[in-house]
Curated annotation (Swiss-Prot):
The keyword Amino-acid biosynthesis applies. It catalyses: (2R,3S)-3-isopropylmalate = (2S)-2-isopropylmalate. Belongs to the LeuD family. LeuD type 1 subfamily. It comes from Shewanella halifaxensis (strain HAW-EB4). One of its GO terms (cellular component) is 3-isopropylmalate dehydratase complex. It is an enzyme of class 4 (lyase). Pathway: Amino-acid biosynthesis; L-leucine biosynthesis; L-leucine from 3-methyl-2-oxobutanoate: step 2/4. Heterodimer of LeuC and LeuD. InterPro entries: 3-IsopropMal_deHydase_ssu, Aconitase/3IPM_dehydase_swvl, AconitaseA/IPMdHydase_ssu_swvl, IPMI_Swivel, LeuD. Keywords: Amino-acid biosynthesis, Branched-chain amino acid biosynthesis, Leucine biosynthesis, Lyase. This is 3-isopropylmalate dehydratase small subunit. Catalyzes the isomerization between 2-isopropylmalate and 3-isopropylmalate, via the formation of 2-isopropylmaleate. Its EC number is 4.2.1.33.
Length: 201
């Protein structure tokens, strides 16, 4: 997992509340167990007018030329609700998203995102609405997200602050998933095992 320090990127709006994981990555695309290749199916039922994915929906923001290459998604409350499938953050990351900004997230999705190097940022309703208005008003609008400073800078330069658990922040800054975090303590683990009394087996 790559460390996340800060990111400045093109922002795209998904102005919907309660975006569930079945909309993020529909169940028919969950047959793989590796993390790559899910981006093409991201928001499939909204991005395409047909089941095969041959007819893009021109009204969906991700299909509009002005949002091509977007890496920051701004959405509404309770993002990532529904089933606990880890494929949802996989699909978002594989598509190219680095940050998801919303007023609130489903708990399991929030944790899965952090474990996969995708930063979920919680801002107030008013701050999210301001970001959406600024992104909509200016083509090519970029947002800056600084995990070290815990700030979000809007396209106009407005500064918002966000909170994240210290442990999650540490893991993201250092590029540590669950396995990486365990390996970072390998010497301590080895020392503990070496000093276990023989009578304990």
């Amino acid at each position: 997992m790559q460390p996340f320090i800060s990111h400045t990127g093109l922002a795209v709006i998904l102005d919907s509340a309660n975006v569930d994981t079945d909309q993020i990555i529909p169940k028919q695309f969950l047959s793989k167990v590796t993390r790559d290749g899910f981006g093409v199916h991201l928001f499939h039922d909204w991005r395409y007018l047909d089941e095969a994915g041959d007819k893009p929906n021109p009204d969906f923001n991700l299909n509009q030329p002005r949002y091509k290459g977007a890496s920051i998604l701004v959405s509404q409350e309770n993002f990532g609700c529904g089933s606990s499938r880890e494929h949802a953050p996989w699909a978002l990351a594989d598509f190219g998203f680095k940050v998801i900004i919303a007023p609130s997230f489903a708990d399991i999705f929030y944790g899965n995102s952090i474990n996969n190097g995708l930063l979920p940022v919680r801002l107030t309703d008013a701050e999210v609405k301001q970001l959406m208005a600024e992104v909509e008003a200016k083509e090519g609008a970029e947002i800056d997200v600084d995990l070290q400073a815990l700030t979000v800078t809007s396209p106009s330069g407005a500064l918002f602050h966000f909170e994240i658990a210290q442990s999650a922040r540490h893991n993201l800054l250092n590029g540590l998933d669950a396995i990486g975090l365990t390996l970072s303590h390998v010497d301590t683990i080895a020392n503990y095992e070496a000093n276990i009394p023989s009578w304990r087996g």
